[in-house]
Amino acid sequence: MTSQQKPRAYLIDSSIYIFRAWHSFDNDITDSDGNPANAVYGFSEFLFELIKKTRSSSGASYIACAFDASQTDSYRREIFADYKANRPPAPEELKRQFSYCRQFCRAAGIADYSSNRFEADDIIGTLAHRLRKQGYAITIISADKDLAQLVLGEDDFWWDYARDNMLNRKGVEKQFGVRPDQIADMLALSGDKVDNIPGIPGIGYTLASRILNKFQTVEDILENISEISKMKFRGAARVQSLVDEHQHILPMTKKLTSIVTDAQFQGPKKDILWQGIDEELIHGIFDLLDAGDMRRKKWLTI
């Protein structure tokens, strides 16, 4: 099957676009009870635009949204208690809107998934794994570099939607300095401040990618620590010493940075083919949001 013949699945890392809408849209946008609704409005605009953009020549669009059910609970916390401990809790005004965003997905006819144990990344990883085996080409919609590790098929893409930056496997390697299948290794070495994942002191993304160009995985590095000092970059002996001193953290950090592809989660069993909105649900959610006629008409005629 050629890339033109393959159906393409668009898997959305929803939280990023909800947070972006929260910061981008005026907070005087409110629902029927006077509560902030700016994130829902922004997210709905994003979904509308995406559906319009991703329709194939046949009119078909395969879309799914993955949500983080909790900002604090994750199986990764069982591995490392301080995982994401640096993040402040979401404001109550935003937490309320996450529920609205999921309701909006259902009203818009978009499959939505979540888990109390696994993160949206793992849901996307599992969906990508399943759908790729079913013959789909995969596009991951996210600004999170972690998810670039899922660009494994020759027709797969990682799409930073807001910046309109779409990368295939070669593009990922050019931008991040490692192959998609090495992204987790790079982050395990360098750490990830956003998620509060520790790394080897003194090793950033550039140096991590250089080491991984010689030793392909964290496991290979651990078997060849004594060879690092022979590499041709300034301070190689010092880097070897640091890796040797902190090697005990690497198996843990590799687990933290690796996306799960066999996660269990809740969501619709139906095909992710977008088959149009549910008009009754659309009217219901827009009533809750106290939306005007213009927004309703736009969705009713999509």
State the predicted function of each range.
Residues 6, 55-64, 166-302:
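Non-catalytic nucleic-acid-binding/docking modules located in mid-to-C-terminal regions
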